[in-house]
């Protein structure tokens, strides 16, 4: 074949590839995420990489709403559940994909004491403050507010939240940012930063609900979970940590060698659990004490679907990770595939300081969540996707 013919064929193939990419059916409709909420405009942004992977982000709650990655056959699959329009996000109480703050997880009785001053926070969960007092009807919690887009490029977006002193009862004027970057190795790199003008507490995380099965009507109980953690923090019947750090060995909390999530919880709820901790959490809703000891170069967790071959590894500079097995998904609203989001159709791996750290930081093995003026809060999480 002549050189000119080869070039012609190559050019035609390139054009076909471009056309195929342009004609790709979008997971979400941008227009369905454009509205005004609490006086601010919401929108939808798409991050892409060299491998045609995508991460879809809305500035409402600085949320990840879709993650498109290839399965073992090269077919693109959405790795997270969530709604397909902004109306559902702004009317149905949910944390799907959100940036949680000021303080992710629970604070006992919604009370913190800083320099002998008692601050009362919302008591929105069994008398405790959960996820910054999240309430879609007020709204409270950073996941229920519209963030400002500071910068956006092809593979990254930075969003900013200006939180006033006294918001949800928390002290200090806080400026917080989250940056999502989709790397060419199919990793989502998340960086949270914050500063304050008054001593306060900060604990930010991402609340994506993973389902790696491709078909999100299939529960995540078939997923294989590995947690690099020899210990966890037990909770009581109100989901509040007791202050104890307990070994996982010989308990359903042991995921050190990788285990099917449903092994100890499939088909069970509430009083049906024999294990006290599973009964207290209505399944898994606990914080694990990571062996990685805040080293974000070491794998903290791995989640794998045997159906698609997709896995996600988690790396973090935080000391803990909350594994939540979607125990309270009740079917309110349908997901992007039209499925009702019912119990255990998604699970969360939330990197974090330990729950109630503001009241337990003096206990052995616990960490402070205090942020002072002049300091910068920095938290890092990587969700590394792949197949096997």
Annotated model-derived regions:
Residues 6-10:
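Sec-dependent N-terminal signal peptides
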Residues 12-13, 217:
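Alpha-helical transmembrane segments and their juxtamembrane interfaces
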